[in-house]
A protein has these predicted regions:
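A generic structural micro-feature
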Residues: 6, 80, 101-105
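Catalytic core of non-heme Fe(II) oxygenases with the double-stranded beta-helix
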Residues: 85-135
Length: 135
C-alpha cells in the first residue's frame, strides 16, 4: 500500500527573536490600537478585534522573524515571502473566537502574547473537514 500525503496541514511553532525584549512594546501597541478604536470590528469574535493593520515598528519585528523563517527554511521554496496584514484580538474572560478560516491566505499565524491561568486553548481543526461528512 502507498500513502500519498496529498493535502497535509503543517503547523509550525516559531520563536520570535528577542520576543522578551518586545513583549511590553507589543502590549503597549495593542492597548494604543484599542484606545484609538475602542469599538473595533466584529468578525469571528466576541472580544475586541482591530481593523486590519499593515505596518508599525513592533509589527516590523514580527514580520522580520516570519520572513527570516520562510526564506531560510529548506522546507518551503518561497521567494519574496511577504506579510500582507495583521489583526489584533483582545479577549476578556468569557470572550471567544469561533472556528473560522482565512480565505485567500496561503498561510496564517497566531502570536499569543498574554494568557491568564485557566484560559481556553488555541484549537486547530482540519481545513478539509467538509470531506469528513456524508451528504
Amino acid at each position: 500500500m502507498t500513502v500519498i500525503p496529498l493535502f497535509p496541514t503543517n503547523i509550525h511553532h516559531v520563536a520570535v527573536d528577542d520576543y522578551a525584549d518586545i513583549k511590553a512594546d507589543l502590549i503597549s501597541f495593542i492597548d494604543a490600537q484599542k484606545a484609538a478604536d475602542p469599538k473595533g470590528i466584529t468578525k469571528s469574535n466576541t472580544g475586541w478585534h482591530s481593523q486590519s493593520l499593515k505596518d508599525g515598528p513592533v509589527l516590523g519585528t514580527i514580520n522580520s522573524a516570519l520572513i527570516k523563517f520562510f526564506n531560510s527554511n529548506n522546507y518551503y521554496n518561497i521567494q519574496n515571502f511577504e506579510v500582507t496584514s495583521h489583526w489584533l484580538n483582545m479577549n476578556k474572560p468569557g470572550d471567544t473566537n469561533v472556528l473560522h478560516c482565512h480565505p485567500g491566505a496561503q498561510m496564517s499565524g497566531v502570536l499569543w502574547i498574554h494568557t491568564p491561568p485557566e484560559s481556553g486553548d488555541l484549537c486547530f481543526e482540519s481545513p478539509n473537514a467538509f470531506n469528513q461528512w456524508e451528504v
